[in-house]
Curated annotation (Swiss-Prot):
One of its GO terms (biological process) is positive regulation of sporulation resulting in formation of a cellular spore. It holds the Pfam family ParBc. Keywords: Chromosome partition, Cytoplasm, DNA-binding. It is found in: Cytoplasm. Involved in chromosome partition. Localize to both poles of the predivisional cell following completion of DNA replication. Binds to the DNA origin of replication. Gene3D superfamilies: 1.10.10.2830, 3.90.1530.30. Its main location: cytoplasm. One of its GO terms (molecular function) is DNA binding. This is Chromosome-partitioning protein ParB. InterPro entries: Chromosome_partition/occlusion (IPR050336), HTH_ParB/Spo0J (IPR041468), ParB/RepB/Spo0J (IPR004437), ParB/Sulfiredoxin_dom (IPR003115), ParB/Sulfiredoxin_sf (IPR036086), ParB_dimer_C (IPR057240).
Amino acid sequence: MESVVVGEPGMSEGRRGLGRGLSALLGEVDAAPAQAPGEQLGGSREAPIEILQRNPDQPRRTFREEDLEDLSNSIREKGVLQPILVRPSPDTAGEYQIVAGERRWRAAQRAGLKTVPIMVRELDDLAVLEIGIIENVQRADLNVLEEALSYKVLMEKFERTQENIAQTIGKSRSHVANTMRLLALPDEVQSYLVSGELTAGHARAIAAAADPVALAKQIIEGGLSVRETEALARKAPNLSAGKSKGGRPPRVKDTDTQALESDLSSVLGLDVSIDHRGSTGTLTITYATLEQLDDLCNRLTRGI
């Protein structure tokens, strides 16, 4: 299977509230457009295909050849049925940058079209990123690493929280947290994810292993299911703990435990560790200052 890989993450900074869907975001833009002189905003129209530019910050970087070919065949027969969402190019006067619909634009070029329908919006960089993530995640067009990188950019560049992101895309906060953990996997394991040799479920199961590359190869060679992978990972040494007391290999936490740790950590603002021992276990909350301890005690006594 061949893929066309384009673009690299890296956004200009800006701040804007999340927690709303694509239609709400576009509705907000329509309510108060910042129209540049001579720009036609709102309705769709035909535009020469060569004046459209891809967005270098597009969350989706991989386009499967077979998907592009199928879409180009459909476009030859029926045309581009949905307008491509664009904004005025920030770099070149008279041209437009694609906000949503790059796959249609690429397929239209293959189909030999000279013009495509576009819909122009005035959007800032954060709105462009939000729309790109929402469109691709809701359509399952992003691979899991592209999805994780998009979340990382929103958090690091635009100071969004995992809860904000989860509300925007309609996923759980633990889904966002678990997806972002995959960025810590070695490059070789990440390449298996992109190629489809491993699923996100496989990758999450081995994320805490001391040697995820070896486990990944074993999973691929054995054709293991996610459940079989989780059982395999529980027997493997953990990355963080090394050897446990008595020289026994430490237990690998399952994805549910890791997600619960992340949820509690997000609520408390402190590092949280959960260790199961049969039907019992230990919940450890780590604080760095006495002020954090005092705040934790106050919150626990009055109810979080």
